[in-house]
């Protein structure tokens, strides 16, 4: 059975927050995980991160922001049109303008806010708030 690295990564971050900790390290790291972390840093959910080379491969060290509460992968990965974004925001986010959906589009990974500005759809990957 295949392993969902995105779901593992996001549930790891949520568990770290629930334990009351701010710093963590995660292995294995893929380009998708790095892009997710960059979006979360840009949106203010991660204070800082760094990639560390080890004998097992790359490890990502993350410092969570006080604004991070929860993150989770969306399964199944729904294809979403621009006009349907609000429906999924209501479904996955706790309040209006609180949190972000992360979509995979032809222009790379973007948030729901960027997708609305660019008027494009994509495939739902995760949510974070």
From Swiss-Prot:
UniProtKB keywords: Ribonucleoprotein, Ribosomal protein, RNA-binding, rRNA-binding
Task: Report the InterPro entries cross-referenced here.
Answer: Ribosomal_uS8 (IPR000630), Ribosomal_uS8_CS (IPR047863), Ribosomal_uS8_sf (IPR035987)
| Protein name as it appears in the record | Small ribosomal subunit protein uS8
For this protein's source organism, the top of the classification is: Archaea, Nanobdellota, Candidatus Nanoarchaeia, Nanoarchaeales, Nanoarchaeaceae
Function comment: One of the primary rRNA binding proteins, it binds directly to 16S rRNA central domain where it helps coordinate assembly of the platform of the 30S subunit.
The protein's assembly and partners: Part of the 30S ribosomal subunit.
Q: Name one GO biological process term.
A: translation
Q: Which domain of life is it from?
A: Archaea
Q: Which family does it belong to?
A: Belongs to the universal ribosomal protein uS8 family.
Q: Which Pfam families match?
A: Ribosomal_S8 (PF00410)
Q: Which Gene3D superfamilies match?
A: 3.30.1370.30, 3.30.1490.10
**Any one cellular component term from GO for this entry?**
ribosome
An MF annotation (GO) of this entry: rRNA binding
């Amino acid at each position: 059975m295949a392993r969902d690295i995105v779901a593992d990564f996001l549930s790891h971050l949520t568990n770290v927050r629930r334990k009351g900790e701010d710093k963590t390290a995660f292995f294995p790291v893929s380009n998708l995980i790095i892009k997710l972390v960059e979006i979360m840093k840009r949106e203010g959910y991660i204070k800082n991160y760094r990639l560390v080379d080890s004998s097992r491969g790359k490890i990502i060290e993350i410092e969570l922001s006080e604004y991070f509460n929860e993150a989770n992968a969306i399964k199944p990965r729904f294809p979403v049109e621009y006009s349907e974004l609000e429906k999924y925001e209501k479904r996955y986010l706790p309040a209006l303008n609180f949190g972000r959906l992360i979509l995979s589009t032809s222009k790379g990974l973007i948030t729901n806010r960027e997708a609305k500005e660019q008027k494009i759809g994509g495939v739902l990957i995760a949510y974070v708030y």
